Amino acid sequence: MSALDFLVELGTEELPPKALAKLADAFCAGIEKGLKDAGLGFAKAQAYAAPRRLAVLVEQLATQQPDRSINLDGPPMQAAFDAHGEPTQAALGFARKCGVDLAEIDRSGPKLKFSRTIEGQPATQLLPGIVEASLNDLPIPKRMRWAARKEEFVRPTQWLVMLFGEQVIDCEILAQRAGRESRGHRFHSPGQVHISKPSSYLEDLRGAHVIADFAERRELIAKRVEQLASEQNGSAIVPPALLDEVTALVEWPVPLVCSFEERFLEVPQEALISTMQDNQKYFCLLDTNGKLLPRFITVANIESKDPAQIVSGNEKVVRPRLTDAEFFFKQDKKQPLERFNDRLKNVVFQAQLGTVFDKAERVSRLAGLIAERTGGDKARAMRAGLLSKADLATEMVGEFPEMQGIAGYYYALNEGEPEDVALALNEQYMPRGAGGELPSTLTGAAVAVADKLDTLVGIFGIGMLPTGSKDPYALRRAALGVLRILIEKQLDLNLVEAVNFAIGQFGTQVKSAGLADQVLEFIFDRLRARYEDEGVDVAAYLSVRAVQPGSALDFDQRVQAVQAFRTLPEAEALAAANKRVSNLLAKFEAKLPEAVEPRWFDNATEFSLYSALQQAEQAVQPLAAARQYREALERLAHLRGPVDAFFEAVLVNAEDASVRANRYALLARLRGLFLGVADISALG
């Protein structure tokens, strides 16, 4: 079957830059799906996108749909005709379903049959519908109309190219009649661009100062920005999202170096970077020490004969924004950071939980407790907690919300606060996302954990639990943040104590009955997904969850030990034995003896197990107390022999009540020894 290349390009007014790549990929995916559904084979489909165009090039597309055979079975002959040979409703209904007269139905077999070959349609007839369906299915949140047209799209359309081989496909889509005339660069080549065939698309447009390949433009910008930064003895900050957005804004990228006055470097560099990236789409430059250079890179969409004019224009545009940041910084420094807390007394954190200042005071006290328990400085943690929200009332954060915490850090340093206190004002928000950076100081860790626990307890305490995809207070992220800090920073905090302390601070503002258990369960539930991501078997997590350690660090140490224990040859048998013991003890209704009495033993294996347990207790209990859980489980693995022998030789449910109770006490002692680490019956 013959095949030709196919090209579709929809020209528009400037498309939303943040959505361009997504729209192009969806357009291509929709066409691929349409071709496959139609049975039209092809070699490859490639999406192209620039600010004023979406395009898809399909290589070696079949020119004809294959023929299809339809074979339908109808009702049995005895149901199709009555005793007089007249067709029944079943026969007539089958004929209607097939779209033919009953005379055309095959009656030669035991059932009515209908067979027909449907000739495949030419691709040229199918492609307009496939393209239109793909465009209709694009992920466009809000479509628009233009002029007096009824058609809707993300932006008004300007032209349409549809070529199959060298032939134009005659059709109209979104108010545009298909042709072979594209458009070049808006300034360098504003006229029509003749596309002779699909395979020449990229080069035809390149000659008109348009790089239609999004990936090519992206790479060109990234390399040139890196090169220019190096020439300035610096390195560029190139966030992937910003690079994508800039790529979507230009058809013919020309990166240029610009500069600003060095006096602006007195302003926190994060504020300068934020305004240059977010508002102006510039790439900022850092020196070898990570400090901001008074230069930036803009990406022009034109190859100017006088680049200095473009540079000058961008420098004039950015100056007022940097001046604003400088003004806010100087204004804020006119009063102590702590004084901004007065403004927070009028800012509501949550209607039922008081003001942001109330929260800062709670965080301060809780951070002090956490620091005290984890080897930090209580006074500094309390000071950092008290100042933790002050910068929310500053002019800087009011203008640049992303500066919360960062502004506080600079203002605290400026006032002579200890460095760990200043750092904590920023580190309280860490980690800012999955895999995000953790606090570098004990003070920062204490405030970060305190802030998150206060939010968890408060929001849970008023019954606003996260449901499904709705989590307005980011409680899942807060719980994960607490766990990451405590585990990865090796901080041994009793979360039961910390959560109860947090509850006590709210007084009657929260419903305290059962609240601690609810919050702790929510926090430790988050560990399951964490371990699954790390490749830890869920059974190891469940075995530790069953013994309910109060410390996240302790929990993790136990899980790692159980995971290692599972690799031992004795693990499977001991897990099964523990499960058997657990089931037996659950069914024992009498009161267990306080101690095991050897005088009730009547089998040598009972003595052997008892002796082995005594030796194991002496070795394991100190190990468990020292949290050397892996070594403890390795030592407990030696019990496999005595345990197997016991169950093989002894009937636990002896007729004599005293013997029976004593055997249950022996098994309870065995189970208790393992429960000092984890419930390994969960591994069985």
From Swiss-Prot:
The protein's enzyme class: ligase
Pfam (any one): tRNA_synt_2f
E.C. designation(s): 6.1.1.14
Recorded superkingdom: Bacteria
SUPFAM superfamilies noted in UniProt: HD-domain/PDEase-like
Keywords: Aminoacyl-tRNA synthetase, ATP-binding, Cytoplasm, Ligase, Nucleotide-binding, Protein biosynthesis
Catalysed conversion reaction: tRNA(Gly) + glycine + ATP = glycyl-tRNA(Gly) + AMP + diphosphate
Single annotated GO MF: arginine-tRNA ligase activity
PROSITE patterns, A to Z: AA_TRNA_LIGASE_II_GLYAB (PS50861)
Primary localization: cytoplasm
GO cellular component annotations of the record: cytosol
Claim: RNA-binding is one of the keywords in the record: no
Subcellular compartments: Cytoplasm
GO terms, biological process: arginyl-tRNA aminoacylation; glycyl-tRNA aminoacylation
Subunit-level organization: Tetramer of two alpha and two beta subunits.
Family per record: Belongs to the class-II aminoacyl-tRNA synthetase family.
PANTHER family: GLYCINE--TRNA LIGASE, CHLOROPLASTIC_MITOCHONDRIAL 2, GLYCYL-TRNA SYNTHETASE
Name used for this protein in its record: Glycine--tRNA ligase beta subunit
Provenance organism: Stutzerimonas stutzeri (strain A1501)
Taxonomy of the source species: Bacteria, Pseudomonadati, Pseudomonadota, Gammaproteobacteria, Pseudomonadales
